[in-house]
Curated annotation (Swiss-Prot):
Region: Disordered, residue numbers: 61-82, 109-199
Official protein name in the record: Homeobox protein Hox-A10
Bias (Low complexity) ranges: 154-173
Superkingdom classification of source: Eukaryota
Annotation: DNA-binding region: 197-256
Residue ranges, compositional bias (Polar residues): 61-76, 109-128
Gene3D superfamilies attached to this UniProt entry: Homeodomain-like (1.10.10.60)
Length: 271
């Protein structure tokens, strides 16, 4: 126990004071100081009345803190019995500190309050007003004219596309076929053309038609065996040869009928 007594603090007769931070948190002000805090304003020497009015309306926390600090500095000469106050120990440093913070805090927030609570700027409303005026200024006649122009342009573009046909790949790759087609069109007396000048559809080549015409001269009606032989020699199917002979017989019958009518009409003279 003797060693512990050496290292431990000696017994003190007086009461130890609590640290300053705890005392400041638990300190209480008299009734007259609290009433002054409720009706506190900035001093006329530090800031003008207009700035004080705007700061009081917009920033109540700043004003309450600064007012309480000013009251403590001004009432530093009145000591409170039984309590330790920081204003008694450091009066000058606190005055300079809070006076600087009050000035710095008041200056940057004044333009913000003017911007927020003032009249809205005219530049923000100008584009909307211009858009409304432009929409109101456009008359229905102008809208109808623009719609008619667009329809006319669309119709003209579609007509140009239809009038200019896209050249097929076969025409691009084979110019010789074009010359052959032109030569055939020039021959008006060709047996492939009718009296009206319209070109008939002919799925047979010239060699095939010549072979079939030769066989038709010998025999108008073919047996099945002979039809198969001709189809092999001409590289056609049995059905194609059969259809060609049927059409050729109908054509011959029509030609005979026309010739008979022509002979009968030639004998009678109509006056």
């Amino acid at each position: 126990m003797s060693g512990m007594e050496v290292w431990s603090d000696p017994p003190r007769s007086c009461r130890m004071e609590q640290p300053a931070t705890q005392q400041v948190a638990t300190c209480s002000f008299p009734q007259n100081i609290k009433e002054e805090n409720a009706y506190c304003l900035y001093d006329s020497e530090k800031c003008p009345k207009s700035a004080a009015a705007t700061d009081l309306s917009t920033f109540p926390r700043l004003t309450s803190e600064s007012c309480s600090n000013n009251d403590t500095t001004t009432s530093g000469g009145v000591p409170v019995p039984g309590y330790f106050r920081l204003s008694q120990a450091y009066p000058t440093s606190k005055q300079t500190l809070y006076s600087n913070t009050g000035q710095v805090g008041a200056s940057p927030f004044v333009p913000q309050s003017q911007i927020r609570f003032g009249t809205p700027p005219s530049s923000a409303s100008t584009p909307t007003e211009l858009g409304r005026k432009g929409s109101e200024g456009t008359s229905p006649g102008h809208l109808t004219c623009s719609s008619e122009r667009e329809e006319a342009e669309a119709a003209a573009s579609s007509a140009n596309e239809e009038s200019s046909p896209v050249p097929s790949e076969s025409n691009k790759n084979s110019p010789e076929k074009e010359t052959k087609g032109e030569v055939k069109a020039e021959n008006g007396a060709n047996w492939l053309t009718a009296k009206s000048g319209r070109k008939k559809r002919c799925p047979y080549t010239k060699h095939q038609t010549l072979e079939l015409e030769k066989e038709f001269l010998f025999n108008m009606y073919l047996t099945r065996e002979r039809r198969l032989e001709i189809s092999r020699s001409v590289h056609l199917t049995d059905r194609q040869v059969k259809i060609w002979f049927q059409n050729r017989r109908m054509k011959l019958k029509k030609m005979n009928r026309e010739n008979r009518i022509r002979e009968l009409t030639a004998n009678f003279s109509f006056s």
